[in-house]
Amino acid sequence: MEATRRSRLSLSRRRPPLGVRPRSNTAGSLPDGGECAKLWTELLRTASADLNVDGELPPLPAFPDQEPRRSPERPPPETFTVGTETFFWTPFPAPSPGRGGNSGGSDLVLSAVRGRTGSPQQYAAPELRGTPSAEEQPSEEQPSQRQSSVDGAMTLQSCPMCQVDFAPGLAQLDIDGHLAQCLADSTDDIEW
């Protein structure tokens, strides 16, 4: 039976030797009156002078042009039920009174960028300017890159890669599509 007792290990608290007492230093008392103890005492006194009775630090000073704000009041959580589950949701806080209740932040930004508000009919349309005509452009063109002026837009007469002539009524989108296809099929580097 004694063998089974020895095989079981049990933990027990050690007792301190009789000659040694545990130190009982509290935060306010320091062992000797040396220079180190005086420095620590002064540090503790300075730090505790900033504490309130509750142990909280005093509020930080307000920045210039910043009025102190009260803590935002949180609206009560709303509940909604889906099937047998009930969910809680805290709604967003209401906008501050200075921003206006109905207009969003993007409206304020857009009106500030525009510098004006109102409907577009109140303002004159901007002046439309066309592209320069072919006569105003210096012509250093090769025959394959000959351009004509149609409605103020410059168009190519032929493809610079495969030399195919474009039909006179061909839309710019069709010309761009042909050029893209030629570029995709081409393995040569073309300098424009």
Swiss-Prot record:
Protein's name according to its UniProt entry: Fanconi anemia core complex-associated protein 20
Entry binding sites for Zn(2+): C159, C162, H178, C182
Skewed-composition ranges (Low complexity): 132-149
Role, per record: Component of the Fanconi anemia (FA) complex required to recruit the FA complex to DNA interstrand cross-links (ICLs) and promote ICLs repair. Following DNA damage recognizes and binds 'Lys-63'-linked ubiquitin generated by RNF8 at ICLs and recruits other components of the FA complex. Promotes translesion synthesis via interaction with REV1.
Superkingdom of origin organism: Eukaryota
Region ranges (Disordered): 1-34, 51-151
Subunit structure: Component of the Fanconi anemia (FA) complex. Interacts with FANCA; interaction is direct. Interacts with REV1.
Keywords, in A-Z order: Chromosome, DNA damage, DNA repair, Metal-binding, Nucleus, Phosphoprotein, Zinc, Zinc-finger
Biased composition (Basic residues): 1-16
Gene Ontology cellular component list: chromosome; Fanconi anaemia nuclear complex
